[in-house]
Swiss-Prot record:
Residues 440-457 have a biased composition (Low complexity). This is Oviduct-specific glycoprotein. GO terms for biological process: carbohydrate metabolic process; chitin catabolic process; single fertilization. It is found in: Cytoplasmic vesicle, Secretory vesicle. GO terms for cellular component: extracellular region; transport vesicle. It comes from the Eukaryota. Residues 22-385 form the GH18 domain. The lineage of its organism: Eukaryota, Metazoa, Chordata, Craniata, Vertebrata. Residues 433-480, 503-539 are annotated as: Disordered. It comes from Ovis aries (Sheep). Residues 1-21 form the signal peptide.
Amino acid sequence: MGKLLLWVGLLLMLKHHDGAAHKLVCYFTNWAFSRPGSASILPRDLDPFLCTHLVFAFASMNNNQIVPKDPLDEKILYPEFNKLKERNRGLKTLLSVGGWNFGTSRFTKMLSTFSNRERFVKSVIALLRTHGFDGLDLFFLYPGLRGSPARDRWTFVFLLEELLQAFKNEAQLTMRPRLLLSAAVSGDPHVIQKAYDARLLGRLLDFISVLSYDLHGSWEKVTGHNSPLFSLPGDPKSSAYAMSYWRQLGVPPEKLLMGLPTYGRTFHLLRASQNELGAGAAGPASPGKYTKQAGFLAYYEVCSFVQRAKKRWINDQYVPYAFKGKEWVGYDDAISFGYKAFFIKREHFGGAMVWTLDLDDFRGNFCGTGPFPLAHTLNNLLVNDEFSSTPSPKFWFSTAVNSSRIGPEMPTMTRDLTTGLGILPLGGEAVATETHRKSATMTTTPRGETATPTRTPLSSGRRTAAPEGKTESPGEKPLTSVGRLAVSPGGIAVGPVHLQIGQKVTPPGRKAGVPEKVTIPSGKMTVTPDGRAETLERL
């Protein structure tokens, strides 16, 4: 009864903390229908009231024009996807172009000249309006990396400005609402510094989805969690760190959405007896029955796995993992999603992004908690103004909630990144080719060189706890509040920070290290980082 009352109190506090609804942006992939059996899903199976924005992934590009990736998209999936708005008039739909398998070469070619970009912009407006989408999402992974030249960091900004201006002009001419413009961006500080001018992206985009997952996986030599909320000493990668980093670079927090994964990353343990966080590992665990991708399990596959596995809770990172024999998976559940929703509210971010609805237990057949249990958790905590009829997840917060944030000085990134940098593809995108999307052809994308810093394995005696708060170390009492110590790549220790309920959080006031005299061509003008405009001839 005590925990139930605490849950109700937390839910009320979350819903009324800032008096404003948050965005819940949910992706749906166009290869989800080709998964076998009960893992197959079509747009008609989605709940139109679950998310504030639905994003269809992905469109493709041909001859500098946006095009459907598959003929079935235009004939079946687009109409079904946008027909959901007939049931929920407030729902917004966007079409995403790009993705990991898309690569960078077509983006680079399109960005290289004004005429190529103009051709792309015109095709975008035509395709979106023809099929009834409300906006465009750019999933360019990543400007200036993976074979993309360094200049793409700036030509990408040109494209954003030209898209935004064209959307405004089209809205004025047609008297229709302006098309939305968003982008998915990396949550890795090393990639962020190479790929983006964060402050300009913050000015030009309606919202930004931070890919704060795939932070650890089977490409590493020790186990690590896919999407931890907080950082560990010596390992700054976390959702909180990624969000705070983007904010520190000058992006308005209300435009930043935390990416939450509905899947887990797996490892094959070197020894079954050493199964803690930081244990030695050699490659991925077995592929899932439905997703068929090594090192990866959809949430509905995780639910099947944990029924026969041992579960643990990482106190310092507010996320669970499970293991059975030599198989290990770090994943998110309704409890960890709840903690992340609390962090989003406390830090006044714009909301959450979910990758993807088709990896959640969308029919409720596997996890026993109803359809879309993870997305429903976020909907209840971030979107709805009143209690939903959907059963609430069972988890509990202490009155002291911890926050990890960037220190007063931005860390200096010294690690050199090359265009050959190997970065893991986003979760679930394991399609072998553009034209063959059946599950039988799905393979794991080659990873090449790892982008993650070398991690120091944690001691095998590290304390862990089950989700109910019971520690696994002998003789220890359940923890209700854990201090936070986050260490930046520059060695800056941050924390511990304890936020009490009702305490006001002041965003970092120091501006990021943006060059003072570098000018960025923008339309017919050059925009300096401080916002001043000067006339300059354009590319």
